[in-house]
UniProtKB/Swiss-Prot annotation:
This is GMP synthase [glutamine-hydrolyzing]. The gene is guaA. The keyword Nucleotide-binding applies. ATP binds at S235, G236, G237, V238, D239, S240, S241. The lineage of its organism: Bacteria, Pseudomonadati, Pseudomonadota, Gammaproteobacteria, Enterobacterales. Keywords: ATP-binding, Glutamine amidotransferase, GMP biosynthesis, Ligase, Nucleotide-binding, Purine biosynthesis. Pathway: Purine metabolism; GMP biosynthesis; GMP from XMP (L-Gln route): step 1/1. Residues 208-400 form the GMPS ATP-PPase domain. The keyword Ligase applies. It comes from the Bacteria. GO terms for molecular function: ATP binding; GMP synthase activity. PANTHER family: GMP SYNTHASE [GLUTAMINE-HYDROLYZING], GMP SYNTHASE-RELATED. It comes from Escherichia fergusonii (strain ATCC 35469 / DSM 13698 / CCUG 18766 / IAM 14443 / JCM 21226 / LMG 7866 / NBRC 102419 / NCTC 12128 / CDC 0568-73). Residues 9-207 form the Glutamine amidotransferase type-1 domain.
Length: 525
């Protein structure tokens, strides 16, 4: 019998902050399971979840507006600790009898708060001391409104000159509110505050660890599928690879992985996937060479969104055909991760805008009538990687830069042709190889090469040539929502350019993309 790793759990109510998923990841890093729900949950849903504690996230709205979100009243009647962050503190204060006002100026950035009263939340935690020995905390503020009166049964724990109630607490009810963001690294002791709340105040044990998550996932897969056969589309990406390894550990030969080689992968990627999963780990893999089929479907198409949809459609067709060849397969496995689940739930409210369609949305035709196995659906990407390491997958593969689902289909601008893909594969391999040699690969968040369908004059030896152009792209980002172009050294860029032009016959010019996000997106298409 495996240990119940969901025994202690934190419920995070999302009021729309850009940092809310980060709060959840921090709680998970503390070894405690948590879930992220929209703020408008019912009392019955909270009771069913049975949380050990509740966190109210930040958010962009103003609590002074009549129709702004509020925490369900049951949150404050459930008898569990509650931690309000920024907007979460403001709605807590307002709902429990305090007062919030719009501030004349938005407070954004570093601040130093002075601890003026003892509280379980910050006891013994400090960055510095005042002249008279009071603790100071370096925090990150990001708010427009502020609490101007706390509820009568709360105390002021910390304040700044411009924010009289930076931390408030009701120790008896174990309600806490902070006007700053403890989840961001700029709040230096933020992780300790979250740990104090989750581990000490809520008394949650650290049961959420990679080894225990694997044991739990394996047990749940076995319980769900029994002796039935399962099929999985293996791409070589992190999510499908870790899904494959978990299923292999759980059901062994009853898993069949279908690897569709669409001709849009990186240099030697198909061989690497087959070697590692087939030869090294002994998984049962069906290799489907489908380059010609994908490229013929893409012929003549220039629109990026149309290309994505074509690649997705052809993949489903090929996968469908292979699945029908297998006898008695009852289950389809997918590498859905927790942010996908959150995103789908958000989209159901109609509030999310589609910037680019996800390649994996849609799934298989209804007539296949398979059950769905999603062993990663509770996990964030960083947790998936840690589990992959625990399962024996190589670090370099798990921590590779992101690669789009449609592959080179959206890194070749305009129409996709085999010639363009072959040139791009080789140029990109040189860029990545040089980044690794210069110890720059892990210093940038994502790096890749883009093929531009324009020719440029070049000189080789005594002759002129009229060949293609590629662009190098490297960015630095924390969350991929915004990004800066990476300031790579000039001599490094020169070395990469020289190698590509000299070694890849057909490319005459290399440029470097210096666009940030926004206004540009990270990928060109």
């Amino acid at each position: 019998m495996t240990e119940n790793i969901h025994k202690h759990r934190i419920l995070i109510l999302d009021f729309g902050s850009q940092y809310t998923q980060l709060v959840a990841r921090r709680v998970r890093e503390l070894g405690v399971y948590c879930e992220l729900w929209a703020w408008d949950v019912t009392e019955a849903q909270i009771r069913d979840f049975n949380p050990s504690g509740i966190i109210l996230s930040g958010g962009p709205e103003s609590t002074t507006e009549e129709n702004s979100p509020r925490a369900p009243q049951y949150v404050f009647e459930a008898g569990v600790p509650v931690f309000g962050i920024c907007y979460g503190m403001q709605t807590m204060a307002m709902q429990l009898g305090g007062h919030v006002e719009a501030s004349n100026e938005r407070e954004f950035g570093y601040a130093q708060v002075e601890v003026v009263n003892d509280s379980a939340l910050v006891r013994g935690i400090e960055d510095a001391l005042t002249a008279d020995g009071k603790p100071l905390l370096d925090v990150w503020m990001s708010h427009g409104d502020k609490v101007t009166a706390i509820p009568s049964d709360f105390i002021t724990v910390a304040s700044t000159e411009s924010c009289p109630f930076a931390i408030m607490a009701n120790e008896e009810k174990r309600f806490y509110g902070v006007q700053f963001h403890p989840e961001v690294t700029h709040t230096r002791q933020g992780m300790r505050m979250l740990e104090r709340f989750v581990r000490d105040i809520c008394q949650c044990e650290a049961l959420w660890t990679p080894a225990k998550i694997i044991d739990d996932a394996v047990a749940r897969i076995r319980e769900q599928v029994g002796d039935d056969k399962v099929i999985l589309g293996l791409s070589g990406g992190v999510d499908s690879s870790v899904t494959a390894m978990l299923l292999h550990r759980a059901i062994g030969k009853n898993l069949t992985c279908v690897f569709v080689d669409n001709g849009l992968l990186r240099l030697n990627e198909a061989e690497q996937v087959l070697d590692m999963f087939g030869d090294h780990f002994g998984l049962n893999i069906v290799h489907v060479p489908a380059e010609d089929r994908f490229l013929s479907a893409l012929a003549g198409e220039n629109d990026p969104e149309a290309k994505r949809k074509i690649i997705g459609r052809v993949f489903v067709e090929v996968f469908d055909e292979e699945a029908l060849k297998l006898e008695d397969v009852k289950w389809l496995a997918q590498g859905t991760i927790y942010p996908d689940v959150i995103e789908s739930a958000a989209s159901a409210t109609g509030k999310a805008h589609v910037i680019k369609s996800h390649h994996n949305v849609g799934g298989l035709p209804k007539e296949m009538k398979m059950g769905l196995v999603e062993p990663l659906k509770e996990l964030f990407k960083d947790e998936v990687r840690k589990i992959g390491l625990e399962l024996g997958l190589p670090y370099d593969m798990l921590y590779r830069h992101p690669f789009p689902g449609p592959g080179l289909g959206v890194r070749v601008l305009g129409e996709v042709k085999k010639e363009y893909c072959d040139l791009l594969r080789r140029a990109d391999a040189i860029f990545i190889e040089e980044l690794r040699k210069a110890d720059l690969y892990d210093k940038v968040s994502q790096a890749f090469t883009v093929f531009l369908p324009v020719r440029s004059v070049g000189v080789m030896g005594d002759g002129r040539k009229y060949d293609w152009v590629v662009s190098l792209r490297a960015v630095e980002t924390i969350d991929f929502m915004t990004a800066h172009w990476a300031h790579l050294p000039y001599d490094f860029l020169g070395r990469v350019s020289n190698r590509i032009i000299n070694e890849v016959n057909g490319i005459s010019r290399v440029v470097y993309d210096i666009s940030g996000k926004p206004p540009a997106t990270i990928e060109w298409e």
